[in-house]
Amino acid sequence: MTFYNHKEIEPKWQDFWAKNHTFKTGTDSSKPKFYALDMFPYPSGAGLHVGHPEGYTATDILSRFKRAQGYNVLHPMGWDAFGLPAEQYAMDTGNDPADFTAENIANFKRQINSLGFSYDWDREVNTTDPNYYKWTQWIFTKLYEKGLAYEAEVPVNWVEELGTAIANEEVLPDGTSERGGYPVVRKPMRQWMLKITAYAERLLEDLEEVDWPESIKDMQRNWIGKSVGANITFNVKDSEESFTVFTTRPDTLFGATYAVLAPEHALVDAITTEEQAEAIAEYKRQASLKSDLARTDLAKEKTGVWTGAYAINPVNGKEMPIWIADYVLSSYGTGAIMAVPAHDERDWEFAKQFHLDIIPVLEGGNVQEAAYTEDGLHINSDFLDGLNKEEAIAKTVAWLEEKEVGNEKVSYRLRDWLFSRQRYWGEPIPIIHWEDGTSTAVPEDQLPLILPVTKDIHPSGTGESPLANITDWLEVTREDGVKGRRETNTMPQWAGSSWYYLRYIDPKNDKAIADPDLLKQWLPVDIYVGGAEHAVLHLLYARFWHKVLYDLGVVPTKEPFQKLFNQGMILGTSYRDHRGALVATDKVEKREGSYFHIETGEELEQAPAKMSKSLKNVVNPDDVVEQYGADTLRVYEMFMGPLDASIAWSEEGLEGSRKFLDRVYRLITTKEMTGDNSGALDKVYHETVKAVTEQIESMKFNTAIAQLMIFVNAANKEDKLYKEQAKGFVQLIAPFAPHLGEELWQVLTDSNQSISHVAWPTWDENKLVENDVEIVVQIKGKVKAKLVLAKDLSKEELEAAALSHEKIQAEIAGKEIVKVIAVPNKLVNIVVK
């Protein structure tokens, strides 16, 4: 039986594409542009897994489709190659992280090429290449000049095992590090911060301009966390000191019965009484060991210590005890809250635990039993009594401003971006600290500041990076003899990925990030495909940098990525025992269609789960390509289900996709071709062209493949195939199965040209219309027959056809026809007696 020999055909066309630079980015300025971007991978030692090609195949189908439609297509690939894993490996083995990274990139590239993706490799970027990170450093110097990069002594999320601080976004809900799962503690350190908060409002507003999944927009909105309220000043009793509180509910000020400061608040030591000093110091020490997430966990028991001091409530002059508690963060708002326990669950729990006053100021509920958090008219609130929420907020803010003890305020949950890492394998931060106390950026003509090669990349132990150990690199002298030290912190992995999509546009430019005319031509990115896990990290950081570059006049658009699509996760096959515990696949055997634990004999339930080394259910694409071919993997991953759904991997599904490609191969290579069109396949062919075109546009790849299958089934029923329709069909399947597409195009055309730039087929709407219709024939309103007749017959023709039908003649034999009602294209009703 004829079948598709992938082991021969796929390498042949991969060589052809490489030699002929088939996918070189078009530069014809008369053509429209299409920029299709994948989230570039971190080149890990493990190589690609089958989850990577899902998103890559989607952008590849779009890229091939758009080329055929006459677009200039920019479809690049590169490497996000700085980061902790390579450094950790280097520390464990003594090898250079650069060598390890280069080996991993070579392996990734081999795997990617084996899958037939149409990348323009002339535009490859690598974040660890000095010619690339020169511009990462240049962007940093611009941030520094604009006051958007600054140093601060801040409590950081310190991970002892990693020897570095990590960003809030990299701390997991259980208070451990995203990488490695190590304990995270709070520790004050000198750090570089980026002022992303200066762009909070624009980052929020401009989400309206982009075509992104609403779920991702919501995650960014929540992360930015805009809230409108008021700042209120509280004086400390018997003291010159005061502190400010931000609240979204200034109207509940009459119900504020105590205040809470973050343990790190600058005022704590100044107002603490002698009697409370020891307890306060111990509490501060314990709080410093916890991450922000652990401190704000709603389920944890409320803890706190009274400072011994009181604040004066400005609206009624009442004394409010001032406490410290770790659920208040110094980094959020002002680091101080006014507690209204009657109407806030956390404040209520705290008040109950420490026997503090609870005064209701809104109607409804029993505040001795639980906090009342619904809205209601105001009570116990003097000039606010009887007002609703909106009226009371407006009146309170006016009162605060009149008395000069507060003002309306917009606050954001978003914090500035902790940008420094105490590691070796990252971009050096181009700053020099001079002994006269000043700091300067490395001048542009001295960039890139090269990361020095060293064998000793262990953390310095002082909290500085290993670069602090390399004195000949570290120490510099100015022309006037003033000595200085280079910045020893390096940038986080997020730095290089915050602007890489710009470098693809002009990757060899040594005078600028990219030529301004080329940036104008290619931006914004038309489609960006990647995982939803990057919603508030990479995607927010890239938008921030893009807006800074927009303000500098470097880029012409406000937003980098016009359309974002998150592919789903490909789950592995896994097995659960009666307790719900997962069992590794090498401990499972299949008997008579059921699955059993090899060691215990227990019958197991098959269940999809995330692929992981521990479950031994990771599928390596190399194995799939070897056994089934790259085109099979591509078609299978697109046919599994909707692109954004999470779906379990299935060998049976893979085999089904392979069989389909074999049927396609047989159809084109063995069916007799003809130059005469019988018209038999016109309708299904034009339906297929239309459906596949529209479904690729809308990224419904699974339904596009289903339509291709419908055409193959119909074509197999015919003795001959109209050659032009066969060619059109091969063009339709080529973006999904490009090696097969090229091979069959060659079979049909005897051409040695690639199918890649052949114009996309078009459909004829007239051919989609049915020429025949089904006519229902009724006698006295009851259906007696259904006739297939030519469309648009006259009433007389319909009547004649109905009355001459043998079944109808038998029904009306011996009866008198009273009248015949004919409705064109629908029915004939015969009335008899």
Swiss-Prot record:
A motif ('KMSKS' region) lies at residues 610-614. One of its GO terms (cellular component) is cytosol. Pfam families: Anticodon_1, tRNA-synt_1, tRNA-synt_1_2, tRNA-synt_1g. Keywords: Aminoacyl-tRNA synthetase, ATP-binding, Cytoplasm, Ligase, Nucleotide-binding, Protein biosynthesis. It comes from the Bacteria. It comes from Streptococcus uberis (strain ATCC BAA-854 / 0140J). Belongs to the class-I aminoacyl-tRNA synthetase family. The keyword Ligase applies. This is Leucine--tRNA ligase. It catalyses: tRNA(Leu) + L-leucine + ATP = L-leucyl-tRNA(Leu) + AMP + diphosphate.
